Structure formats: structure tokens, C-alpha cells
Amino acid sequence: MKDLLKFLKAQSKTEEFDGIKIGLASPDMIRSWSFGEVKKPETINYRTFKPERDGLFCARIFGPVKDYECLCGKYKRLKHRGVICEKCGVEVTQTKVRRERMGHIELASPVAHIWFLKSLPSRIGLLLDMTLRDIERVLYFESFVVVDAGMTSLERSQMLTEEQYLDALEEYGDEFDAKMGAEAILALLRAQDLEHEIATMREELSQTNSETKRKKTTKRLKLMESFLQSGNKPEWMIMTVLPVLPPDLRPLVPLDGGRFATSDLNDLYRRVINRNNRLKRLLDLAAPDIIVRNEKRMLQEAVDALLDNGRRGRAITGSNKRPLKSLADMIKGKQGRFRQNLLGKRVDYSGRSVITVGPTLRLHQCGLPKKMALELFKPFIYGKLETRGLATTIKAAKKMVEREEAVVWDILDEVIREHPVMLNRAPTLHRLGIQAFEPILIEGKAIQLHPLVCSAFNADFDGDQMAVHLPLTLEAQLEARALMMSTNNILSPASGEPIIVPSQDVVLGLYYMTRSCVGAKGEGMVLSGAKEAEKIYRAGLASLHARVKCRITEYVKNEAGELVPKIELKNTTVGRAILSLILPKGMEYALIDPPLPMTEAGKAELAEHPERWIKYVSNQAMGKKQISKVLNTCYRKQGLKDTVIFADQLMYTGFHYAALSGSSVGIDDMVIPDAKKDIIAAAEAEVAEIQEQFQSGLVTAGERYNKVIDIWASANERVSKAMMENLSKETRQNSLGEDEVQASFNSVFMMADSGARGSAAQIRQLAGMRGLMAKPDGSIIETPIVANFREGLNVLQYFISTHGARKGLADTALKTANSGYLTRRLVDVAQDVVITELDCGTSEGLWMTPLIEGGDVVEPLRERVLGRVVAEDVLKPGTEDVLVARNTLLDEQWCNTLERNSVDRVKVRSAIACESDFGICAHCYGRDLARGHLVNNGEATGVIAAQSIGEPGTQLTMRTFHIGGAASRAAAESSASVKNTGVIKLQNAKSVENSAGKLVITSRSSELTIMDELGRTKESHKLPYGSVLEVKDGQAVKAGEIVANWDPHTHPIITEVAGRIQFENMIEGITITRQTDELTGLSSIVVLDVNERTTTGKELRPTVKLVDANGKDVLIPGTDVAAQYFLPGQAIVQLEDGAQVNVGDAVARIPQASSGTKDITGGLPRVADLFEARQPKEPAILAEISGTISFGKETKGKRRLVITPTDGGDAHEEMIPKWRNLNVFEGEKVQQGEVLADGPESAHDILRLRGISPVANYIVNEVQDVYRLQGVKINDKHIEVIVRQMLRKCEIVNPGDSDLLEGEQADVVRVKIANRKLVAEGKQPATFRRVLMGITKASLNTESFISAASFQETTRVLTEAAVSGKVDDLRGLKENVIVGRLIPAGTGFAYHHGRLEKRRQAAKAVVPVTQQATADEAEQNLADLLNAADNLNA
């Protein structure tokens, strides 16, 4: 028996493999797979349910229906294993062979494989250089094709209609050979000499100049080369033998009532066999040509339907009018093999139930219903029962468990001890959607969840359900405990901030207990310590909010690093003192009670009246943000364990005091301000006035509408301001008898103020006014809802507000689907980015500066570089001293150092610049955000990045924003004023000084920045061309000063030299007209548009030249170019010919069409556009090269822009539509990549003209803008990881000595590796330029065809892979999941490394492989063993 077991173990050993190759199957290969030919369309006998012989379920071909039993029943039982029954021909073996044995059908006529025919581009068409239409006409018997022209004037693969064929037959007889149907295509493919074709095509490529021809030839060449290299033969794309799927994979199940449920494939196979057999008969009978042709065409259609139903013509439908599911449908789509069964499986040892709240649990625990636990832990219980000797067999143990005997519960308790379970809440949007907990057995049927982990799961208790999974093996339990335990996941992997943060009740409780109240019971007491504070509160001698003096003990680290107590008398409140009891040792008291900064006046008052200290107690209560900050500080200072305990204590305390506070909301809590009536009345009066003006024709309809909306918007603001002031403050008398203003104890206000629930905007709707509402099309209705919810809405108001509510619901549904799809694309593109090495050694990276918009620092440098590795030494500003050495990980301490030394730009390592071949290195990635140290090898950073970007997707909006009304008017600014005091610094600004001694800006992208005394950038303002500066570079300014002015409505042309004006080609009535202003009486010259001019004026170009007193041209300083300014159409000149001008004067002005309401694409669609690298509609036009601008000959709708390079290379020309507003003038110098015409910039242009860093910065900043608007924090590095994946392809510019083709797209890594090899051999490496690819395209273009096929467009990916005989090396995560291996990341990283090492060792020492026994030998051995065993028994 032992031998037998050993033998069975050896049988089930799987082959080790390192890769999977896909290719075309030759007819011989198909026959070698097959166990026999299927000749009949019959399936099973309806009476006996036995499979018919030679049919689709034949037992002789596919194996026995019952284990170890032949069909006729002559041989039964294991001992006859391997015998072939002489009566029914069935081999006696296991029935599972019916899942793996294939059959085949010998086709009477060859048939084209529809994938290689119809999947675009058609592979057969490309190879034969025929159009798909022509090939289809041949295949479906509509025309002939010449296969062999012989000595005739016909050409090979020439199409002939029926008549032409007959004519040719008459003319040439059997000199030539023409056929129709798949035979013809087969003959053509066989006749192709690939090597010869490739040689001629390479010849052609080197000679041709036509772009289209080159593209087409390159495509054909690549296809032929891939055929040649892969060993596939082109004629295998035409099938002569059809494989038949094993029957158990296309089951036929009898239902009750004599009907059968069957897989659609059986119907499809039946049609093929029927038609094939009929065709064979017809051919034997030598039937007329037309009949045979029709039958062949039907066979072709039947095989098409079997392989991919509906790909050509109408889909074949079953009895119930729905299309049959073909082989291709089996594997593609959400319900296909890949996504349904390989990537997402259902799991054993799992259960699900509703969740309820478990406020008494510890952070690492969850409550598990006893019933569930008993079911999940069954095998463990059976095992324990047996080892204890309480049950003799498994069966007995099973009985005991079913009876639920008392001892079973005791054993369950033991089994469950320290055995973590995993809880999962769908949708699992990020890795915190599955966490491990220790189960606590509870009565009832609901799982209890710890309140603090709800935000990670995004769970609430309104009926949410969660699934429980049980890690079985020791390794699984270890991973669950060490990596997935809720206590090990305190920080969010997206931003590195705590995700275990109290919310709602807990926040309210903590806020309530840390509030101070004027004149509360016990005010002014002096207490001996926090314990006493708790005593007097419990005894009812003092209120929780009473302001008292209390001795607080803090623990501070001394020189030796030990904690020593430090006792201090502090002005605080009773509640804060009590809260300090749960603070971990080593945390400062100031975190929960920040001391008030003392002013001089305050100190003087206290010296005079010491009893007034009660007025100097901080009135800052702890809100949600503050609590989060405390937890974060605790984690960084005290470590994980203390933080977890502290978080739990905070929660218990919060719940306790929230209950004691008795906070509740009544209708009287929503106090409506008295000023509301007056504000609304005033607004209505203003609206009436505007209406009158409109009726008397003073304002246009559009202006009136905008005005009205403005009026109501500001009225709404005023009402809500009045309401908040009214609600948030109250006056009370303190113990000294003085009145003090304090924050109100109104419940609604407290909830919003603490961050527990609600916001000012919601309170505004409850107690202010609801305000303006939008119509379904997005436009704003001009009559607002003046009522609020407390007053109640009337019918009209209610109806108006339903629009928004309904749109919100529809949006949410759309948003969820869109967001999920974005996450899926992101995961797919980044799935194989894993940390593979410690340091790739690059010194490249990104420059990080604080993000500043106008006067506000949006994101300080500290937040941008925290957790990054420095790429170049950071020098102390103004010196050469190294402050931070290269390759240092910037943690909180280093960031403090940077801030102290006021560094404002740092070059950090980035995933985009990482030089690792596969994956990225730890230094380029930096800190693992969820753990707070340098990232470990094998961390799946790509998936984490994708989850971090995709998870908040549902919070983003779906809509396009319209800026209208107030916002659009605010946009037309005419000056810049500073918010901070500091020193002016101009960035890339060219300027001239005008006669008044002020600087006039003459460059496009100038910025004015304000530096503080330490040299840090505080704010920055963009200065348009022609702005007049009120200050000089380096001048000190005070906050609120105006630093620059400009005219927002016109675009000036500034002269850079002084001189006299001379007009050229300015002819009145032909190129210009004069206009006189009615109000001022001043006349000005207006240049006519080209299309307004007469024919004589079309060619003329109105110009203003500057000449000196002698009439000579004045040159632009520093060049030998004459100062002349060409005037575009509509330009206004207010000077006369011969007038004198100074430097910095405007010679002309171009009126700017007021940029109307621009639509800003926001939210999810914007993020998707960025990651898909879509071209914007009208992108900004960038300068292709650096040089001088001039304008060439104009065409009807476009003007010709010419850039002449300064170094004398070839000029670059470009046609630009007339209506585009150009930012440049003739003769201006531009740098490559500068904006010539405004518009949304295209990421592709930025990459091409400015390089990789700018495009990375652009995408990162644009994506961050969208998320920042919603208040979502995501670390930049996640977006960088995705951008790295978008940049992984390149276009070959010059192939050098490599075997790449010019213009071909290839993986950057592959090219780099090939180049290294070429350089080592002393050959010419290939040159390339990087290409930006959208995430969908990048996913489909991965190295791994398994990963691409399981993403989208399965058919196309597999067709392409098969033709080129691709090998999948199983490098990424998806491929390994699909073949059922550990993924090469996380704990599987070491396993894969070990396998690699083993392979390397094996390659070094090649040993003769011991031949494995063939199946037949193995069966023979087993039969011998069994017989021996039987003999022994006998």
C-alpha cells in the first residue's frame, strides 16, 4: 500500500516551467494532442445516457464516464487500471481524463481561422499583401484567385471573377492554376518564400521616401520576421484539422423531465461535424461544383461561428434567439475565463454577515459569531478532537460538532486563540479593504467591527456586510499577523497620514471634554494633579469645562535618553487634565492644550491683577484635525505600540464623554439670524433696479442675468455670515463678574466645529438660506430659494431643489462605475512595478520647490520632499557647505533642518528617473508611506500607487465646471498686489525701463516672486507682457502693496528702443481706417483684418518702424535686426506718423476678446484624460525649436509662422489658424517649448519639446490639482510611478547596428539592454526618443501577453501574440496569479529570487536529466503494483 501511495504522489507532480509560449498549432500538432477522431455529431443516447461511439462525448476517445470502469461494465475496480476493454474500446482509468483528453475533426476542405483573417489588421491579408475584402471574396466562394500563373500573362494572387476565369481557361487552358476557397489561400501561403520576401522588403525600405509606403512595408516586414523567428508557418493560419475540446469542459447535463442542459459549444461542434460529413459525402459522389462550393462555404461559416461567433456576419443563435457562446467568448470579457476564474476566484473557508459596532473591542480584535466560527474552524476542531482522543474518527468528530456538544465549544475557544481571521468589505478599493483581526467569540449573528477601522474599510453600520476569510497554513497566519493586522496598518499608504483617526461621536466627546466654559462650576480652583481633577469632576464639585490651575506631570527625555518626570502648574480645564491621563509617557501636554501666546499687555494685566489668570486659559478645543495630529506625532515619537494603545484609549474616552455630554439636535438649535429679512429685502430691491435698467435698454440680457446671480450669491454669503456669527458666539459672566465672549455650546455648531458631522455649508441650508439652484443643464436659475429647511420650502422651492438632488443620485451611480474602471486601468498598467533593488545608482531626479499660487503656499516644500531620497547634495543657501548629503532619506528631522536653513529647492530621486531594468529601486521610491521607513525589497509599489489614485475616485466630481458671473469678472485682473512682506525677485523676466523710470515687462512667462528674509519663496504672481512694475528687482515691499499694473483688455506692443515712428504700408482705406472716439474726440488708427481688405491690400503688411533723427533704422540692442513691429488685424495705433517714442512705450494695442466663460474639465474625467494622455481639443502651440519668429505667406484661414534658429540650422515652418491668439510678435526670440498660442498644453508636446522632467511635473501637478480641490491627499510618488509606466515605450530614431527598425516602438528597457550589449561589442547603439502612452494603450503593449489579454481586447492581443510566437516570462503580478503561483512581490519575492538562483546554478552545471517515465510505463508499473497487492491479499 505504501508503494501505491508513493506512486500516486509521483503521478501528480507538475512540470516546472519558466515561461509560457503561445503559437500557431500545426495540423500534426493537433493530431498529436488528439485521442481519436470525432466522426459523428451524436452526443449521448437519450435513453441510456451513455455516450455514443465516435460522437462528441465518445468514451473510447475521451475516457471512461465512471472512475476505473469501462463503458460496457466488463472491467471495474482499480486493479484493471490501464486495460483497454476489447468490447467497447474504453481504457479503464480515472474519469478526470475527460477534462484533459482532446479529440479532432479531419476537415474535408481547409478552413481559414477567423482570428487571423478578421482581427484587424488582418494577418493573412498583411502576409499576402491582399485586401481583406478580396480575401473574403475568395474564402466565401465569390471569386477565383490565381495560385500559379505558369507561362501566362496573369499574375500570382490576381483576382478573377467567374467570367474572367472562364475566359482565361479558354485562352490558356491548363497553363495556369486558379482556385477559390481556403484551398486557394492555403496554396498562396505555402508558396511564400519568407526569407526572399524579407530581403526584397528591406531593399525597398532603404530606397523608398514615401511615409505611407514605409509604414506599410515596416508592418509587413515585422510580421514576416516574427513568423520566421517564431517557427510558425503561415499556412497554419488555415486549418485542415480542427481540435475538439475535452467533453467535461463542455458538459451536457440531463435535467429532470428528460431535457438536457448543454454548453453552446456542443451545438457549434455539431454543426461543424454535420456539414463536414455532408461535404465528404458530396465529394465522394463528385457532386456538381456549385453544390460543393455552397457546402464548403457553410463549413467555413460553421467553423467561424465555433471559434468566434458574431465576428463575421450575423451571430448564430440557439433555440432561444440568443447568440451561442463560442470559444472566443469563453475567454474574453468580465465573464470570461481570465477575469471570472483565473484572476478572481471564490474561496473556501469564508463566510459573510452584517456588521455591527463593537465599541468595547481592542483595535486588533473583531467579534465573530459563534455559529460562523464553528463552521469556519471545523477542520481544526476535528483535528483537536482526534488528538485529544475525544473522537476516534473524523466521522465521529463530525457528529460531535453537529450535535454542538459542550466540549466542542471549549475546543473552539482553544483553536481560535491567536488565530487571526481576515475581514474584507467590498468594494476593496485599496489594500486596507482587507485587514486581519483576532476573533472574539460572541453570541448573535452579526460580526462586530472596531469603530476606528471603519474609515479604512469605508464601512458604516446601516446594513453593510463583510466577509470573513480564514488563513489556514502557518505561513498565512504569520503574514496575516505581521503584515495585515489592523494594528500594523495605522498609516494610509496613499498619504502616509494616520488612517486610524476617531470620527463622529468620539470626536464630539473629545471636543466636548476639552472645551472651556466661562463661569462654569468650580472655576478658579487649584488642583494637585490630573487624578484630583477626575475626582472633583466625579464628585460633582466642578464642571468638565471649568478653568482651573492644575499640576501636570510630563515625561521628558534627558541627556541619557531616559524619561524623567517634569511637573508644572498649568492653566487648563478639568476635562483637559483628565484627558492627559491617557497620554503616553513622553508626549507633551501642549498637544492637547496649546498654551496661549502672551502679549505684553497681557503680562502687564496679570502682574497687576493675578486673579485674572482665568482669562488666559486657551479656548482651543480638540477637533478632528488636532486629534489626527496628536496621533501622527505619537506614532513618529513613541512608535507603534504606544499609538495603538493610545488610539484605543482615545476612543473609549471619547464615547464615554460624548454620552455624558448629552449633545442632541433640536429644531431650536438652528437659529435663524434676525438680519436675514433685511438682507433679502435689499437684494430684491437691487434685482428690481437691474430689471428696470434692462427694460430701458441700458444692460444686455446676459449682463442682467450675471448681475442678478451676483447679487443673490453675495446676499447668500451675507446671510450665512450673519448666521454663523449668531450661532458660534455667546456671552457669559465669569467668576469675577465680568462678561466674556466664548464659543457657543449650541449642539449643531459644536458638531460642525469639532469636525464630527456636518459643515458650515450644511448649517447654512438649515438656518440661513438655501441659495441659488442649478437647472439640469447646469445653468443657474436666477431666482434663489430664500427659505431654509427650518422655515420649510414651498412647492415651487421644493420642485426647484429636486433637480439638484436627482442629478446628485445619477452622478453617484455613474461616478462609481467610472472610478472603478479608472482604478482597473491604473492597476493594470502598474501591476509589475515592484521594488527590485536597493539603489540603481542614478543621480537624476526631479527638482522640488514649494507649490505657490498667487499669494498662497499651496503645498510647502516640506510636504513635497518628506520621505524622499536626495539625488544631489543639498547646499546651505549662499555657501558651498553640504547640508544634506546625496542618497539621504529625508525624514521629519531632516525636513526641520531644511526649513531652519530656508532651502527652497531640492533635487530628489524619483521613480521616473530610476535606472532599474525591471521594477524600481528603493532609493528612487523613498519611504514606504504606510510604514515610515525606506521601502523594502519586493514591495508592490505599482499596485499601491494605482489603489491610492483610484480609491478616492468616487469622491471626485463628474462634471465640467462653468465659470460664470462673479468668478469670470474676477478673472480680468489688472494689477498684482502682494500679501506678504518681503523682497521682490523677478524670474525669467526681460524688461525695459520707460521714461517714467518704471520697468515694463517684455517677456511672456515672467513671474514676480516675494522672498522672505531667509530667502524662501512666499508667493508668486504671473506678469503678462506689457505690465508696468511699480517696484524694482530686489526692492523690499510691505504686505498689501500693489507691485504691477496692466490693461486686461488689450495687448500692447512695447518698443524696446527710442526713436521716431515711421509707418509702412499703412494706407488709409486699404490697410487701415481711422476711428474717432465720440466721448474724447481722439482719433486712432485701426488696422484692417486681411479678409476685410481689398485685393490690393491683401499682400501689404502694415508695419511701424523706428528711425533715428537722420531717418536711419534703429537696431534692437544687442542684435543687427531693425526695430520694426508688424501690426496684426484689429490693432489700434494712437500715435501719428513721425511721433517721437521712448523705450517702454506702447506703439500699438491689440484688443483682446474678453475670454468668455471657459469650461474647466474637473474631477474624474480630467484625471482620466491626463492618464490616458489624450490630446486636448485646441492645444497650446509650442515652439518646436529655439530661434527668431517671423511670419511667412498667409493662406485663406491660416497664417504661416516661421522660426529661424539663431545657430543657422533649418528654419521650422508651421501653419496656425487665424483665430488663434498668438502671444508672439515678429522678430521676437523664443526658446524651444515656449508657448506661442495659449490653450491647454498637450503632454505629448511637453515631452517632445521640454523633456521628461517637465512632462512628469505637468501630469503630477495637474492630477494633484483635481484631488486637492476635493481635499484628498495623495503623495506625488504614486502619480510618478504611473507616469513612469506611461513612459516605458520609445520610438527608434536610428537603429544603429541593432535589429530594430526605424520608427518602430519598443520598450525602453529592451533597447537599453540591447544598446549595452552593442556598446560592449564596439558596435553602433540605437538612438531613440521617449513616447508618452495612455494607460490603456500602455497596458495592452506590455511584454506579457497574458497580462494584456486579461485586461482588454483579448482576441487582438492573443492573435498578435500567437502570430509572433511570443513567450511570457511571467514577470509581473497578474501573469503569476493566472498560472497559480506566488506573485513576485511581497513574501513571494524571495521565493522567485530563490528560483532564479536555482535556474542560474542549473544553467552552470548542466547534468543529464533523468528521463521521466511516460504515461504508459507509469500505468504498467501501477498495474504490476496492484496485481502484486492483490496477490498478497489473496
UniProtKB/Swiss-Prot annotation:
As for family, the record states: Belongs to the RNA polymerase beta' chain family.
What protein is this chain from?
DNA-directed RNA polymerase subunit beta'
Q: Which domain of life is it from?
A: Bacteria
Residues that hold Zn(2+) 1 according to the record: C70, C72, C85, C88
For binding Zn(2+) 2, which residues are annotated in this chain's numbering? C840, C914, C921, C924
Gene of origin?
rpoC
Subunit structure, as described in the record = The RNAP catalytic core consists of 2 alpha, 1 beta, 1 beta' and 1 omega subunit. When a sigma factor is associated with the core the holoenzyme is formed, which can initiate transcription.
The keyword Transcription belongs to this UniProt entry's keyword annotation: yes
User: Which residues does the annotation say bind Mg(2+)?
Assistant: D460, D462, D464
Q: Which GO terms describe its molecular function?
A: DNA binding; DNA-directed RNA polymerase activity; magnesium ion binding; zinc ion binding
Sorted keywords for this record are: DNA-directed RNA polymerase, Magnesium, Metal-binding, Nucleotidyltransferase, Transcription, Transferase, Zinc
Cofactor(s), names only, from the UniProt record? Mg(2+); Zn(2+)
Q: GO CC terms on record?
A: DNA-directed RNA polymerase complex
Catalysed reaction per UniProt? RNA(n) + a ribonucleoside 5'-triphosphate = RNA(n+1) + diphosphate
Q: How is the cofactor bound?
A: Binds 1 Mg(2+) ion per subunit. Binds 2 Zn(2+) ions per subunit.
Class of enzymatic activity (EC top level): transferase
Biological process terms in GO annotation: DNA-templated transcription
Is Chloroplast among this UniProt entry's keywords? no
Organism, by scientific name, is Tolumonas auensis (strain DSM 9187 / NBRC 110442 / TA 4)
Q: Which Pfam families match?
A: RNA_pol_Rpb1_1, RNA_pol_Rpb1_2, RNA_pol_Rpb1_3, RNA_pol_Rpb1_4, RNA_pol_Rpb1_5
Show the InterPro entries listed in the entry: DNA-dir_RpoC_beta_prime, DNA-dir_RpoC_beta_prime_bact, RNA_pol_asu, RNA_pol_N, RNA_pol_Rpb1_1, RNA_pol_Rpb1_3, RNA_pol_Rpb1_3_sf, RNA_pol_Rpb1_4
What EC number(s) would the UniProt record show?
2.7.7.6
Q: What does this protein do?
A: DNA-dependent RNA polymerase catalyzes the transcription of DNA into RNA using the four ribonucleoside triphosphates as substrates.
